[in-house]
């Protein structure tokens, strides 16, 4: 088994890490960032962008830039109205009344879109580790339902990952904080306020055991909500000043969202911030004239605290519930761990400090990275890394599970905060005489009545022999695995007839759908690879264009007209096919190689003409003995130039040396620019580039193709001698 990576698939940003030498290490993405925006975009050219690239173009492509998709994964259409009204992209009903996203005429499930983000993280891990990555541990909010967990696992499968474990984000964070403190027995509260969710978990750490005592949270409260209060304030202020409502302007709304996020971040360290958005909209002056409108506002931390106070107060309720469920008091909590970027908000920190009677939270680990680090540790456990074999993680379910019984009552089978994996059964019977079938309505929640809890699924057990009510014995079994995936079965003890269901209906995908999405994901990966190959070839062409022009400029009189004409023709052919987006890569490689050979021929002529002139000049001005000495110097210079092509050895070769030094400098520049794509197979073009211009090769000789000219020149010298 290779390395198991840990992935924090966040609402606004994602992070991935791996265990190296017993220590978790965050992996930087290809752009050098330690977190990757959880954003996917589709351009009008049908190009797919992920991460920072997608975020940069969000303002100009708001309707086709998908963010916060985690808020929709595994959820029903009717449960997401508030979230749907906040996004700029087009949401449509999906299968099983879930939420899909429509871009350029095609529908995407949240699983597919999440898989695109996971694919990007997977590629980054493979580039860092220099090996194929197939296993992962993915984190989810503690309050994620079974359907949301299953949908997240499906996303990993679509991305080509074997999701070995789905673990709760607060639990993962506790692993990151507690790795070096395993011998200390502590009661730890993890407060995880991310981009879209709030999770609170209380764990007992010690002796290598991480036991979750209680968990609570809010799946609809996070950093996005703090951004939204700033957006609403800006909308209100702008309408008051200008009388213009920006709500229907999607481009303006996207700019407001980005400005709100920046303002929120700045107010974590500054007392006030300025929000300047020039040309936010246009207005009619009358007579057909249109003029611009600018938004310029100042927001103080005090005002932000006032706007966000209701949100901060909402974060306290899960704290109270978790404390109560754990059976502990506030004073018995030894440590408070802050996780998630939104915990940087000063008002949130003050509220926590007040709730815990002045106890300072632990900020020793970057809150953006703690969850991914913990997931990497769990990955090390599952991957049997020796350094962490003694860790044991005991996770609990956040909400009770049960079925609907007579009178629409919710009867619990597994109580909340039960450690998983677990399996429990209860025996039920029929509610009326002669009843031959029963519907098993599986629910999740804490309310007494079935209608007040969340439906997970329904199935029918038929073929029950007719009997008086209360006589048939029907055993209902609940089985939850380590990932929190629930299986429910019902068996008639009299006949042995059994029926069951794996709870995955909310956003669940069939195996065929998952396979189809995997194929599409692979197709996109192939398209991405081809696009990078094309960019690499284009970069090589640009280097050749520059070298071509430099050689002509510095050595105009040394190159025959026929050779120049050939090189110019090859250049025009290459430029023409580079303009065609549909041309095959093989054609580009062929034209590039033809042009490269033409440029090399120019260099050959420069070398040949330069050597001839040098020989004639030396013969005229120096005696026979002096000519022999110059011949020796020329041979010595060539030998030195083979191993140190950029060094200056002989003044006679200085001009020639400068020409090829310029060429090689720019070829190297192209290699540096594409060094992050070492895995790309560029075929012959790449091979030729290495053959001709690998300056790190000790045997490198830029003139090895011109041995005949060198030998001829040397023979001439010997003849003179």
Swiss-Prot record:
Pfam families: HSP70 (PF00012)
Presence of keyword Phosphoprotein: yes
Domain of life, source organism: Bacteria
Positions of region (Disordered): 606-649, 667-721
Record field: compositional bias (Polar residues): 630-649
Modified residues (Phosphothreonine): 197
InterPro entries xrefs: ATPase_NBD (IPR043129), Chaperone_DnaK (IPR012725), Heat_shock_70_CS (IPR018181), HSP70_C_sf (IPR029048), HSP70_peptide-bd_sf (IPR029047), Hsp_70_fam (IPR013126)
CDD domains in the cross-refs: ASKHA_NBD_HSP70_DnaK-like
Keywords of this entry: ATP-binding, Chaperone, Nucleotide-binding, Phosphoprotein, Stress response
Induction statement: By stress conditions e.g. heat shock and by hyperosmotic environments.
A GO MF label: unfolded protein binding
Annotated Acidic residues bias: 694-721
Its job: Acts as a chaperone.
UniProt record similarity statement: Belongs to the heat shock protein 70 family.
Name of protein: Chaperone protein DnaK
Organism name: Aphanothece halophytica
């Amino acid at each position: 088994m290779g390395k198991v990576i840990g992935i924090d698939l966040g609402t606004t940003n994602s992070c991935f890490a791996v265990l190296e030498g017993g220590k978790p290490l965050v992996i930087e993405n290809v752009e050098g960032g330690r977190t990757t925006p959880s954003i996917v975009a589709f351009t009008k050219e049908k190009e797919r962008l992920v991460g920072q690239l997608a975020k940069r173009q969000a303002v100009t492509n708001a309707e086709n830039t998908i963010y916060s998709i985690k808020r929709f994964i595994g959820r029903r259409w009717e449960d997401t109205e508030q979230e749907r009204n906040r996004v700029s992209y087009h949401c449509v009903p999906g299968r099983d009344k879930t939420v899909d996203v429509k871009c350029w005429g095609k529908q995407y499930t949240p699983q597919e879109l999440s898989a695109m983000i996971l694919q990007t993280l997977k590629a980054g891990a493979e580039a860092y580790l220099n090996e194929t990555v197939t296993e992962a541990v993915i984190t989810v909010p503690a309050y994620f339902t079974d359907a949301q967990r299953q949908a997240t696992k499906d996303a990993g499968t679509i991305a080509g990952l074997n999701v070995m474990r789905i673990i709760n984000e607060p639990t993962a964070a506790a692993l990151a904080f507690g790795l070096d403190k395993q011998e200390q027995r502590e009661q730890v509260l993890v407060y995880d306020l991310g981009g879209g969710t709030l999770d609170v978990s209380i764990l007992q750490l010690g002796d290598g055991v991480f036991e979750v005592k209680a968990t609570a949270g809010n799946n609809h409260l996070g950093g996005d909500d703090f951004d939204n209060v700033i957006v609403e304030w800006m909308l209100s202020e702008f309408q008051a000043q200008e009388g213009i409502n920006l709500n229907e302007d999607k481009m303006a709304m996207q700019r407001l969202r980005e400005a709100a996020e920046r303002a929120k971040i700045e107010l974590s360290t500054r007392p006030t911030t300025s929000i300047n958005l020039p040309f936010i909209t246009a207005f009619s002056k009358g007579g057909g004239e249109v003029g611009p409108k600018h938004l310029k506002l100042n927001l103080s931390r005090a005002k932000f605290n006032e706007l966000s106070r209701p949100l901060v107060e909402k974060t306290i309720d899960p704290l109270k519930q978790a404390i109560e469920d754990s059976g502990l008091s506030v004073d018995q909590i030894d440590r408070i761990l802050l996780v998630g970027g939104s915990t940087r908000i000063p008002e949130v920190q003050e509220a926590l400090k007040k709730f815990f009677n002045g106890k300072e939270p632990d900020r020793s680990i970057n809150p953006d990275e703690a969850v991914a680090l913990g997931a990497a540790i769990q990955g090390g456990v599952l991957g049997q890394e020796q350094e962490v074999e003694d860790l044991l993680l005991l996770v609990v379910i956040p909400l009770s599970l049960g079925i609907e019984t007579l009178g629409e009552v919710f009867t619990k089978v597994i109580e909340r905060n039960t450690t998983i994996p677990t399996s429990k059964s209860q025996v039920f019977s029929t509610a009326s005489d002669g009843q031959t079938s029963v519907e098993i309505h599986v629910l999740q929640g804490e309310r007494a009545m079935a209608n007040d809890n969340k439906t997970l699924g329904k199935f029918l057990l038929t073929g029950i022999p007719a009997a008086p009510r209360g006589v048939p014995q029907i055993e209902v079994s609940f089985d939850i695995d380590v990932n929190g995936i629930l299986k429910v079965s019902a068996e008639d003890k009299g006949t042995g007839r059994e029926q069951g269901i794996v709870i995955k209906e909310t956003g669940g995908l069939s195996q065929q759908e998952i396979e189809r999405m995997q194929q599409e994901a692979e197709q996109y990966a192939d398209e991405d690879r081809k696009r990078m190959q094309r960019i690499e070839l284009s970069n090589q062409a640009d280097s050749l264009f520059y070298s071509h022009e430099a050689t002509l400029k510095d050595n105009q009189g040394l190159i025959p007209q026929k050779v120049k004409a050939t090189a110019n023709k090859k250049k025009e052919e290459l430029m023409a096919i580079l303009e065609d987006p549909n041309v095959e890569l093989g054609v580009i490689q062929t034209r590039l190689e033809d042009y490269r050979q033409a440029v090399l021929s120019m260099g050959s002529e420069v070398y040949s003409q330069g050597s001839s002139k040098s020989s004639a000049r030396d013969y005229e001005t120096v005696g026979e003995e002096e000519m022999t000495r110059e011949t020796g110097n020329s041979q010595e210079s060539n030998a030195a130039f083979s191993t140190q092509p950029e060094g200056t050895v002989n003044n006679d070769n200085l001009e020639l040396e400068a020409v090829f030094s310029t060429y090689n400098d720019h070829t190297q520049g192209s290699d540096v620019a594409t060094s992050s794509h070492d895995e790309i197979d560029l075929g012959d073009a790449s091979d030729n580039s290495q053959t001709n211009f690998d300056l790190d090769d000790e045997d490198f000789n830029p003139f090895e193709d011109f041995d005949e000219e060198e030998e001829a020149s040397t023979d001439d010298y010997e003849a003179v001698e």
